[in-house]
Amino acid sequence: MKNEKRKTGIEPKVFFPPLIIVGILCWLTVRDLDAANVVINAVFSYVTNVWGWAFEWYMVVMLFGWFWLVFGPYAKKRLGNEPPEFSTASWIFMMFASCTSAAVLFWGSIEIYYYISTPPFGLEPNSTGAKELGLAYSLFHWGPLPWATYSFLSVAFAYFFFVRKMEVIRPSSTLVPLVGEKHAKGLFGTIVDNFYLVALIFAMGTSLGLATPLVTECMQWLFGIPHTLQLDAIIITCWIILNTICVACGLQKGVRIASDVRSYLSFLMLGWVFIVSGASFIMNYFTDSVGMLLMYLPRMLFYTDPIAKGGFPQGWTVFYWAWWVIYAIQMSIFLARISRGRTVRELCFGMVLGLTASTWILWTVLGSNTLLLIDKNIINIPNLIEQYGVARAIIETWAALPLSTATMWGFFILCFIATVTLVNACSYTLAMSTCREVRDGEEPPLLVRIGWSVLVGIIGIVLLALGGLKPIQTAIIAGGCPLFFVNIMVTLSFIKDAKQNWKD
């Protein structure tokens, strides 16, 4: 009995430090929101202006790593001795479906507006040149480059899972080949795990902070319920209670079904927007944008704007590269777990093709629709953002479509389900990472899952209370800094161990 308690109990050294750190930061923020915003702006400016170049070089180096994996000595190595667990079609679909979160729907619908209103390269706002580059930059930020950079971590985790047969629930477990077992299981490994967990908590709170206003704005549009911070807090509380009920009553199968419904509904909604918005324009705009991407790719890769100091690469490229860095471990573990039996080359190509198709389709359809609505003066996004906030502007891009009531119901259900599955995934991932010896496939303790879902919910509410996108962007960038080094260490650990143990 004692052994069972030990197995399912919390791991104090990785449970309490993140809890205390995040709790203190939330308390300090709530005490003085104005002072918190000043600090947030200072942190954002420092990291993006002083260290933005490091994130850009990280992505470029990891891109070269993708080519090394695809064409190097490990390209034909198989990740495990078993045949692939899923058919190729199912495998690609699972990767495709993993990109349909509410946060992705948020950025896909509004991102292009920011690119054309505050464009890069000194272009005039809302000019023809700005509009030509608008979607191209979305394809850059959400295309082959970031997915290729995930390859190293995905291959690394798949190698540790299926070749080395390691139980990996925290990144420190993978660092034994690099720093030795003493350091990986000692203070150094504990620090690494705490960096990972604090960053992950803020990332998940950020996603919740993006998703919640979409749901509450839908409720205002459909039911006339005014969107307030109190309503946001009530909705987040309802999600936490619903997640608790699902876990306590063993309804995890229902959550998985909801995840599948989310995927199919997202395809249906995207198909609807594609048809009624203007399929011909969308395809033409996409084709032109791919050409613009190829033409400007070298400059996009290394654009830091140190002379004109317009702020575009700091506000967007560095922010998104930090976004990719902060989610890299969690996403790579998922991609690795569904890729057992694949070769390294298959995994690398599958990620770039399957995941790029997902994000490119979503950004092309939603971004093109937003641009059409702006060009036709159907909606005034600047006024909507100034008066009501970004979420209202996003809702209006959907409400402007034909059969608006049916469309809004579909979008409301999609966002609600996406956030339910988000809260469930947040609580599960954090609980697994902070409990002692909970193995894959086992359920972590209920109270631990509830506790983490409550904390993530609090972070979402705090970010919403601060208002605007800058706090959300800063939370991602601040969290991305320590994981920048953690990701590199996991990659180097894989390379070192593979050279010694993955020979013919």
UniProtKB/Swiss-Prot annotation:
It catalyses: 4-(trimethylamino)butanoate(in) + (R)-carnitine(out) = 4-(trimethylamino)butanoate(out) + (R)-carnitine(in). One of its GO terms (biological process) is carnitine metabolic process. The keyword tRNA processing does not apply. The keyword Membrane applies. InterPro entries: BCCT_CS, BCCT_transptr, BCCT_transptr_CaiT. It is a multi-pass membrane protein. Keywords: Antiport, Cell inner membrane, Cell membrane, Membrane, Transmembrane, Transmembrane helix, Transport. GO terms for molecular function: (R)-carnitine:4-(trimethylammonio)butanoate antiporter activity. It is found in: Cell inner membrane. Coiled coil: none annotated. NCBIfam families: bcct (TIGR00842), PRK03356.1 (NF002887). Homotrimer. Catalyzes the exchange of L-carnitine for gamma-butyrobetaine. Belongs to the BCCT transporter (TC 2.A.15) family. CaiT subfamily. This is L-carnitine/gamma-butyrobetaine antiporter. The gene is caiT.
